[in-house]
Amino acid sequence: MPDDALPFPRGTHELALDPEVLARELAEELLGDPLDDLDTAEPSAGDVAAECDLGLELLAGDAEQRMQGLRIFCEHRDPRAIPRLLPLLQASCPIVRMSAVYALGRNPSPLAVEPLLGLLTADDNGYVRKAVAWSLGNYPDAPVLNPLIRSLQFDVAAVRLWAASSLADAGGTGPAKADPAASQLLLSLRIDSEPAVRSNSAWGLGRLYPDLVEPRQREVVETLVHTMLHDADSAVRDEARLALEQLEQPDVLERLQTLVDEGLIG
């Protein structure tokens, strides 16, 4: 188990759910590859509206119904759900809190910013903080940059993983935010002990590159090249190379081709 697999309070027996399985299923639904859905028929607007109506009713029901309602709003957006989701951030059951956090990531609201930030810093459950780290990526205009940086510096691996990804979204609104976000991602790419965090840091740097000033862009390129050549984990090396290729900078692509010709990369 990764080090984010924290014990759950005794109160979780009120829902007959495995928190790890639920967290994984919610993450797959929310974070899956969009290409996987290309062959799937989109539900009609009427079907979505009907499902959201049902979700609102379920949120007002018993514990099992409430979880079903939360799953609906992890998938669909409906502003009517916000007043019913916000109180669930204070639920005693961490599974309910986690699910409400994911639902508010799918249904962003200014009213959710303060309680989400409170959970990121103070919730004692790693699954909940992990969900918050993902959800805050959908709040790029809110004051989430510094809290995400702190999480990337100090929290457990699974929280750092999504903090790195969300920093790319939070920092992608202009140079003023992009530079501090890139600074932390560069540091995490160099020193984080968890390969998945380093991979997401490399991906995030590629996303931020267009919003960075030229000296920082050079540092990003040099760090990604060094990672591509020297990181101990092959997945991190591959992610760094992909990030470099996706910059679509002629000088960077030429440099990569030279490394291929010299046999330093495949």
Specify the residue positions occupied by each region the protein language model found.
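N-terminal "cap/leader" segments of large eukaryotic alpha-helical scaffolds
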Residues: 2-61, 67
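A subset of signal/propeptide-processing and intrinsically disordered low-complexity segments
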Residues: 13, 23, 28, 118, ...
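Polar/charged alpha-helical tracts
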Residues: 20-24, 28, 251-262, 266
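Structural detector for internal amphipathic alpha-helices that build alpha-solenoid repeat scaffolds
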Residues: 24-46, 64-79, 83, 87-90, ...
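Amphipathic alpha-helical scaffolding segments comprising HEAT/armadillo-like alpha-solenoid repeats
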Residues: 45-59, 78-90, 109-122, 141-153, ...
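Short inter-helical turns and helix N-cap capping residues of alpha-solenoid HEAT/ARM repeat scaffolds
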Residues: 61-62, 92-93, 124-125, 155-156, ...
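Short, highly charged low-complexity linear segments
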Residues: 128-132, 159-164, 226-230, 258-266
